[in-house]
Amino acid sequence: MEFIADPFADIPTRAPQQKVAAGEEPAVNILVLGTDSRTSASDPSQWKEGAQRTDAIMIVQVSGDRKTVSVMSIPRDSWVEIPGHGQGKINAAYSYGGPSLTIHTVENLTGIHIDHFAVANFESFVALTDEIGGVRVNLKTPQTLAGKELGAGAQVLNGQQALAYTRERSSLPNGDFDRVKRQQTWMRSIVSRVLTNGTLSSPTALYSFLKTASRTVAVDESFTLNQMQSLALETRHLHSNDIRFMTVPTAGTGTSADGQSIVTLDADADAPLFKAFAEDRVSAYLTEHPDAVELLPATVN
């Protein structure tokens, strides 16, 4: 496994940790990045200033009671404050300062304390997809993926086909917003497959899956394989409906003063959602405000 030397050590100001009552467990917040580099993201030594930007940014929260998982995507073109660099697209933080600055930027934006960090390029998910025998998606229209013509409807995609599915952008009516949904679809499909194919109930299968993940994903040095296995076992009872995928509410798209195409976040809608994540109250927030956030359907397209 490739480990990233403590990416939290150089962050001057951290978001506060969640307060929990005696005997309770806090939520676990993992910042997951997908890079736009075609080189292996499992080798953190390959990071160089200005060389890579993040193609996907997701906060994955495992609730303290281990009954739900919430995944919140932040559009890569979101215009935010990058500490030490002024306003910029959030995906530039990784280019400017690697894992540490990215964590600092996300915590500064959301107020959510990040416990662990993971980074991969989406080619890394090819191996995970093939490890579990492919992923199921519903194609709205016939598509050619990785050289194979596929009809509309339910299809099982191998790793290369799933990669092509998530990289498509030009034909999508909402551009990057639809691409984010496809990235979420791929992740949901992997998780659903793992939950239903016996991986979590078989120590051998779980170890094999995590070993494949460890070869293709770089994590912070405190996130050991044993910790991953323990967290997976604690959530083995979850069903697909217990895992919610959402995207940070936005106010629209525009152009920055220097001519960049950007996404403007909706501060009024984002603040209570970020607070719910920070306090491990996502389930309650979504119940109380069912129209506040668009959730990816359990049956994904």
Residue ranges and their predicted role:
Residues 1-66:
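Entry/capping segment at the start of metal-dependent catalytic domains
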Residues 61-64, 79, 95, 107-111, ...:
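Sec-exported extracytoplasmic/periplasmic mature domains
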